[in-house]
Amino acid sequence: MPTDTFYRLPQQKRDRLLAAIHGELSRVPVTELSVNRIVHEAGISRGSFYQYFRDRDDLVQYLLEYVDSCFHGFITAAAPACGGDPFELLRRFLSSIRAFGDDPVNRAFCTNLLAHLRANGGVQHCRSNAFSPEWIEGMFDRYFDRSRLNLAEPEDFKLMTELMQTVLQGAVAALFMPGADADALERAFDRKLLILQRGMLKKEAQADAC
């Protein structure tokens, strides 16, 4: 976590530092991040940097929290326009991530950050608590109607949202793999959502499965 000193920085100075970090991570992997290059680009001293972050892991954790805050902002802005359809929100979310990654600098940044996460226990191992089950439940009930879901057991809602998250996270990670075919990935993502919406068994087979 960044120190309180970082959060007390004027917004302009904080944005300049974040832009320098973004630029550095778009050029090199996390393991090759240069504090010297970051502070030079941001126009601050090396000592100041370590007043804001303890080490590289601290910096990566902050980047994850920053990304999560951007995701929160997108969800809050997009959800009201989805007509009460949570699957439409996921489609719009992936489209926005794809558009973000169309910029080569953004794409390199995300590719390097995701590669670091995969090498260090995966995304969930490193994430903040920004997308806790409580946050997801509150967000869903604010913008969507839970009564439209086919919930057979009390725990089904949590399991359903976990499935949706898994499909979304897999699609986002795949978008930033070398040689990714974004059109094909988006089509496959849409098909997976349709399968989740309708279920996997034909109606005549559902009775046999119960």
Feature locations, PLM:
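Amphipathic alpha-helical packing segments from all-alpha helical-bundle domains
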Residues: 111, 118-170
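Hydrophobic/aromatic residues within well-ordered alpha-helical segments
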Residues: 13, 56, 63-71, 93, ...
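Alpha-helical DNA-contacting segments of helix-turn-helix folds
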Residues: 16, 53, 60-70, 74, ...
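C-terminal peripheral helix-coil segments that are non-catalytic and often amphipathic
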Residues: 170-210
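Secondary-structure edge/capping motif, primarily at the C-terminal ends of alpha-helices
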Residues: 78, 82, 108-117, 171-179
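Basic, helix-initiating cap at the start of DNA-binding domains
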Residues: 1-28, 37
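Hydrophobic alpha-helical connector segments
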Residues: 62, 76-105
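Helix-turn-helix
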Residues: 16, 27-58, 62
